[in-house]
Amino acid sequence: MPEVHRYLCDRLLMMDKGKVVEDGDTETVIKHFLAPIEPVKPLAPIKDEKNAVVWIDGAWKKYDMVTHHTLIRTIEMQDINIKIPRGEILGIIGPSAMGKTVLMRLLGGFEKPDRGHILIRIGTVDFANIAEYGKRSIEARSKLGIIHQEFALPPYQLVQDLFARKIGLKKLEMINQAMAKAKEFGISDVTMDVLLRLADLPEAEAKGRLRELGFEIDVLDDLFPKLPVREAFKAAEPYLKAVNLPEDIFTRYISETSVGEEIRLAIATLMASNCEILLLDEPFGDIDPISLRVVTNSLKELNREFDTTMLVVSHQLDVIRELTHEAILIDEGVVAMRDKPDEVCDAFIERRFK
C-alpha cells in the first residue's frame, strides 16, 4: 500500500505484466502508479437516522483467543449496545483480536451472545432476534449478506451458477419453497435455520460444521434449488451495473476475473439475493489501491441507489475515512468510541481511546 511504501522505502520499483516499468524515488513512482485512480465519489446522506434496522441490545460474549491450540487470553465483550439506521455505512476499527470479527459473527448469526439480543428489522416496526433459531430468524437473516476475511469464490465455477446458487440460498421466496420441501423429510424450521447459517460460512468451515451435524455439503443443493439462469441474470443485471461490472462477466468462470472484480461479484451476488444489510469483515485483503477505489465507489453507489446498510471492518483507515458515515472503535471487547470517521481514526492512531 502507498502509505506503507512512503513510511519504509527510499526507492520503489513499479511492475506491470511481469516487467519493471519504473524505478525511482518513492513519491515519484507512487504518483505515476496512482495516476489512473478513479476520483472519490461522494457519500449519500443517511435519509432517516432514527430508522434503525440493526440493533445490538445489551450483548455479552466471552471468547478465547487460541493460537496453535494454545490459549492466549480470554476477552469478554461487555454490554454492547449499537443501533444502526437504514442506509448507514458504519466503519469498525480497533486493535487486532479485540472483538471486531466476533461482533460480525454475532451480527451474522454464527455465534450466540451469552446475554442480550441481536435484532434485525423484519417489518415496519418489528424486529427479530437472530440469537434465537426458527422461522423469524430465517426471515431476518435473509436480509443479511456477509463477506468474510480472506474470502475466495470457487475459481472453476461459472459466474452465472454463483448467482443462481446464492439467490436460491438467500431469497425469501426460494427459502420458503425449501422449507416446504424440508417438512416432507421431517426437517424442522430450527434445523433449516442452522443449515442456512452454515451456508453463509466460508466453505471449509461450513463443511466441517455440517459433518458435525451428520450432513454433507450436498444437503444444501438438495434442499435449496438454484434459480434458473435466465432469472438469475435478470436479478443480477442492476447490481452488476451498480458495481461497474460488464454484463458479459455473467458467462465467465470466476478464475477469469481479477481480484477487484471478484470482490464486486461477491457483493453483487448478495445484492441480487435481496440482501439489505451487508457485513464486510476485512474483505479487501491485498487489493491494490486503484482497484480498491473502484470497490469503495461501487459500495457507495449501492448505498445511494438501494439504501443498503453496511458494516465494514477494516485495518485500512483510508477506506474507513473515505467510505463510512460513522465509525466505532472496539478495544478489549467494548465499544471505546463512536464518532465521525476522521475523529475515530485519528484517536486510534494517537491511542487517545484508552
PLM-predicted stretches and their roles:
Residues 278-281:
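Catalytic Walker B motif of ABC-type/P-loop ATPase nucleotide-binding domains
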Residues 146, 151-161:
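Conserved catalytic motifs of ABC-family nucleotide-binding domains
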Residues 117-139:
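ABC ATPase NBD Q-loop/coupling interface
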Residues 1, 314-315:
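H-loop/switch region of ABC-family ATPase nucleotide-binding domains
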Residues 157-184, 200, 209-222:
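Q-loop/switch helix immediately C-terminal to the Walker
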Residues 19-40, 334-354:
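Conserved beta-strand-loop-alpha-helix hinge in the C-terminal portion
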